[in-house]
C-alpha cells in the first residue's frame, strides 16, 4: 500500500530523534496526511500480515461503549491487555467517550448518524474521544489512574469528522500520536471499515478515508521491521464485503464482514512500547 510505505520513507528520511513517555525513543515528524479512495479497494497493509479479527472486534467493542477488555479477551484479542487493571478495566476510553461523553449520556455516534440522515451538509459531524477531564496523571500507574476514574492511556486517534459529497461519505481522522509500525496499519483499516459501515446504514457510498497525523513516529526498536517492509513488494488491495441486511450501526456482528482477496507477506513481530 503505497500511501503507508511513503509515510514510512518520509519519517525515516525527514524525522528527528526524540525521547518519549516509554523511554524507547522515536524518529518523529509532526504533521502528515494520507488519503485512501475506498472505491479502489480496502486499505489493508500487505507488506506484513494484519490480524483482521482484532481490528473488527476492537471496532465493535468501541461501538458497544465498553471499557472492560472482557469482550476482547473472549474473542482472542489481546491488544489492550498491557494497559488494563487487574479487573480488565481501562477507564473511560474510546467507546465510553463515543457513546456516553463525560458520563453525560451524550451518544456521539447516534447523534452523528441522525445528522448524516437529516442534514448531510452539516459541518458539525465530529466525534471526539479526547476529554481533558479524564486524562491520566502521568505520575501514576495505569491501574491507579483507572481507580481514579481516569483513562489508562490517552486516546491516540483523538477525533474524526464526516463529510458528504455527491452521495459519498468521507471520514477524516486526526491522530495525535501514531506508532507507524504497529498502530497505524490497524488504524487505517479500522477507520476505513467504520466509514463503510456508517455509509451503509446512511444509504451512502463510501468515499475517502483521510488520515491526518500530529506526532507520527517510528520507535527505535522498529527500524529493522520497517526496513523489511520497505523491501517487500506491495500486493493488490483486497475487497471488504459488508452484510447488506444490516441497517443499524449497532447491529453489526463479526460475521457481517468478509474480506476477499487479501494476500500479504508474512507477519513481522515488533515489541509494543508500553
From Swiss-Prot:
Q: Which GO terms fall under molecular function for this chain's record?
A: thymidylate synthase activity
GO CC terms: cytosol
Q: Which UniProt keywords apply?
A: Cytoplasm, Methyltransferase, Nucleotide biosynthesis, Transferase
Pfam families cross-referenced by the UniProt entry: Thymidylat_synt (PF00303)
Which positions in this protein are listed as binding dUMP?
21, 123-124, 176-179, 187, 217-219
What task does this protein carry out? Catalyzes the reductive methylation of 2'-deoxyuridine-5'-monophosphate (dUMP) to 2'-deoxythymidine-5'-monophosphate (dTMP) while utilizing 5,10-methylenetetrahydrofolate (mTHF) as the methyl donor and reductant in the reaction, yielding dihydrofolate (DHF) as a by-product. This enzymatic reaction provides an intracellular de novo source of dTMP, an essential precursor for DNA biosynthesis.
Task: Name the family the entry cites.
Answer: Belongs to the thymidylate synthase family. Bacterial-type ThyA subfamily.
Q: What is this protein called?
A: Thymidylate synthase
Q: Which organism is it from?
A: Flavobacterium psychrophilum (strain ATCC 49511 / DSM 21280 / CIP 103535 / JIP02/86)
